[in-house]
Amino acid sequence: MANTSRLPTSCVIPTGGISTGSRRPAVVAFGCSTDGSRGSRRSGVGLVLCRSSSTAGAGGGRKMEDYNTAMKNMMRNPYEYHHDLGMNYAVITDNLIVGSQPQKPEDINHLKNEEKVAYILCLQQDKDIEYWGIDFQAIVSRCKDLGIQHIRRPAVDFDPDSLRSQLPKAVSALEWAISQCKGRVYVHCTAGLGRAPAVAITYMYWFNNMDLNTAYDKLTSIRPCGPNKRAIRAATYDLAKNDPWKEPFENLPEHAFEGIADWERKLIQERVRALREA
């Protein structure tokens, strides 16, 4: 059994490939030659594979094996993360992209030049980045060079309580970045299938006049994944209910806060926007 004490945790790509039932999102795979030029090929899904610069090297296979074993033991879901395939992402809306961690500065070049990204919202903790041997300072430096604003709102991976508590601040940062209308926002965690889609779904739920299931289905039909819906419902409850005698969330039915009244949405939006200065 893998030693999970040293592993960061993250949701990952399904072993059986990505499918959306009858709909197949268009895949674009990018390659980068030694002189930095790119080639691309399309196959038919919303997933984009940017293979300019995977950091997988010696021991990378073992790291992925340990990581995926830990993930299956802790989360019992069908997903796996293949770091060796490079950064991957899906365009969710005209201004919102959800994906995996950038691995090299070349990935930042791609996001800027090919996807017109102006903001990157990173949900990883330091240990998540260090585990994969990514030169984080080089990533941040390239963002600065290209005029991309890099924002961090870390949450503990595979921890629904951490996700619940961090969603309001992460969504606040995302809503602010989108409101600036300067370019797309790239939201990522490690694999882009847990924390990052949860933040994107929550943003659509709270700010795009959708119920939770509609927002959840919209994103997962484009990028198949399994973000924690209960954590989103709990974060919604935390913001919408300020009565000190309110019934604990844990006592509510499973469907509670999958939808909200207009006044609750307005209250949530006010509270989330107030976190910009927090």
Language model regions located:
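PTP/DSP superfamily signal
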Residues: 2-17, 21-77, 152, 158, ...
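Beta-strand-turn-beta hairpins that frame and shape the catalytic cleft
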Residues: 89-96, 148
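Short acidic, glycine/proline-enriched helix-loop-strand junctions
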Residues: 99-100, 129-155
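Non-catalytic positions within long, well-ordered alpha-helices that form the structural scaffold/packing
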Residues: 112-116, 178
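Acidic beta-strand-to-loop metal/phosphate-binding motif
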Residues: 119-127
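Short, acidic/polar
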Residues: 103-113
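Structural motif corresponding to alpha-helix initiation and N-cap regions
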Residues: 104-105, 136, 164
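Short acidic/polar active-site loop segments enriched in Thr and Asp
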Residues: 117-119, 183
